[in-house]
From Swiss-Prot:
Region G2 motif: start-end pairs: 127-128
Main location (coarse class): other
Name of the protein this chain belongs to: Sarcalumenin
Cited SUPFAM superfamilies: P-loop containing nucleoside triphosphate hydrolases
Organism of origin: Gallus gallus
Modification after translation (UniProt): N-glycosylated.
G1 motif as annotated region, ranges: 99-106
GO (cellular component) term, any one: sarcoplasmic reticulum lumen
Spans annotated as G3 motif: 189-192
Protein family (similarity comment): Belongs to the TRAFAC class dynamin-like GTPase superfamily. Dynamin/Fzo/YdjA family.
Protein topology in the membrane: Peripheral membrane protein
Length: 472
């Protein structure tokens, strides 16, 4: 009898154990296949990454020799607040994640890098979880870097962030992860936008910091949750900052499998209705509808559509990675164009000031008259008569009131005086970089030849192929 009772107890225990395991298996979500992600981003390829060290060295030399002298002489950084460092020239492409709180930005990064259920994964949750600007970059081992260390390291591209103060640096964190994708790209996760919170409560200029990252991002993902489309004043401010960057913006309607088909269509229309006043361009940004996390899609949803949308987004990301060197050269060339226009404007202001000054004139009153009404003296119209100057590249007239408010006109020299016997003229050097050296360097990448900036034999001095992913 005792043996029978013991046998019954053993059988009951096994049944209970089996039931518990079944419940545990049923409660654990099934993971999605990642082969499409690895194939699209070419993470399985064993070939080494393209070595652009020679091109980067030449690009850095062109910048320091031909662009930076004019940039410093006419204090361009005080107008645009965008100082280019060596770290920025050599940096990897940056992908920026923006959007309201708890829409899945951190979860999306975890999914792209396969960090879920690993010690490396970013913390996620239903509540606002990310209060820092988190830079996820490549490193030999898992390592966390404080913001003050990142800003102090001149080899990185984040040293200019010191200007936002110590309060911000405490909210900046870097994470190094040994991942193949991070060898070619850097991800930046941002704090979620909370409409009912004043940005002043953050203790640092949140919008200015966002603008800094926006100006340097190669691809910008603006993520939304279909269950809470909260488009308010703070999000409106964000899209105002994104103006002019429409070609880099990708809008993501995340967690799409959490809604039925009809509800998803309504949300899709509501999203466009809300964003239409904020994006005033003929061709709207691309919108991706999917669920970017590692678990299987919910049953009875458009799985094939979501998968195709995800692959399209991955192809977009891969294009930015493949074109990283072309983007870098195009960005430096565009920067050089703006520096040249700024120098021409300052030179014209100075020349007009000298022409209007007499022995009995009050210099301050004369220049105030010029700055208040530059059109009266044809300042900007005269610049448009110069070669290769577009009216769409001209800075705002109001910006020069502030610029000359802190930079006296008498502290500048005319462009004709910015020449030396050995070094040549600053203006001629930057024009040569814009029209010959940088286009030649760009052409040498596609042809796989060593850059030759002494002639136009390789690509000619004509127009370079259009790159729709380049920075504006």
């Amino acid at each position: 009898m005792k043996r029978l009772n013991l046998l019954c107890c053993c059988v009951a225990s096994l049944l209970l154990l089996g039931t518990a395991e079944e419940v545990e298996d049923a409660s654990e979500p099934t993971k999605r296949d990642r082969s499409h992600l690895e194939n699209t981003l070419k993470l399985n390829e064993d070939k080494p990454a393209d070595d652009f060290s020679g091109v980067l060295q030449r690009l850095r030399k062109i910048y320091h020799a031909s662009i930076k002298p004019l940039e410093q002489s006419y204090r361009y950084n005080e107008l645009r607040q965008h100082e280019i460092t060596d770290g920025e020239i050599t940096s990897k492409p940056m992908v920026l994640f923006l959007g309201p709180w708890s829409v899945g930005k951190s979860s999306m990064i975890n999914y792209l890098l396969g960090l879920d259920d690993t010690p490396y994964q970013l913390y996620t949750g239903a509540e606002p979880t990310t209060s820092e600007f988190t830079v996820i970059m490549h490193g030999p081992k898992l390592k966390t870097i404080e913001g003050i260390v990142m800003a102090a390291d001149s080899a990185r591209s984040f040293s200019p962030l010191e200007k936002f103060g110590q309060n911000f640096l405490e909210k900046l964190i870097g994470i190094e992860v040994p991942h193949k994708l991070l060898e070619r790209v850097t991800f930046v996760d941002t704090p979620g936008i909370i409409e009912n919170r004043k940005q002043q409560e953050r203790g640092y200029p949140f919008n200015d910091v966002c603008q800094w990252f926006i100006d340097r991002a190669d691809l910008i993902f603006v993520v939304f949750d279909p269950t809470k489309l909260d488009v308010g004043l703070e999000l409106e401010m964000l899209f105002r900052q994104l103006k002019g960057r429409e070609s880099q913006i990708r809008i993501i309607l995340n967690k799409a499998d959490s809604l039925a088909t009809q509800e998803l269509m309504r949300v899709y229309g509501a999203l466009f209705w809300s964003l239409a006043p904020l994006i005033n361009v003929t061709e709207p940004p691309r919108v991706y509808v999917s669920s970017f996390w590692p678990h299987e899609y919910h049953p009875d949803t458009h799985k094939d559509l979501f998968l195709k949308e995800e692959i399209s987004l991955l192809e977009d990301l891969n294009q930015v990675i493949e074109n990283r060197m072309e983007n870098k050269i195009a960005f430096i060339r565009q920067h050089a164009i703006r520096v040249r226009i700024h120098a021409l404007l300052v030179d014209r202001y100075l020349q007009t000031y000298k022409d209007k000054m007499t022995f009995f004139s009050d210099g301050e009153l004369v220049f105030r008259d010029i700055v208040e009404d530059p059109d009266k003296f044809f300042i900007f119209k005269s610049i448009l008569a110069k070669t290769n100057v577009s009216k769409f590249d001209l800075p705002n007239r109001e910006a020069y009131k502030d610029f000359f408010g802190i930079n006296p006109i008498t502290s500048f020299k005319l462009l004709s005086q910015q020449c030396s016997y050995m070094g040549g003229c600053y203006l001629e050097k930057i024009e040569k970089a814009i029209t010959r050296e940088l286009p030649d360097l760009l052409g040498s990448i596609g042809l796989g030849k060593k850059p030759n900036v002494l002639s136009c034999d390789v690509t000619g001095c004509g127009e370079t192929p259009k790159n729709r992913y380049k920075k504006p």
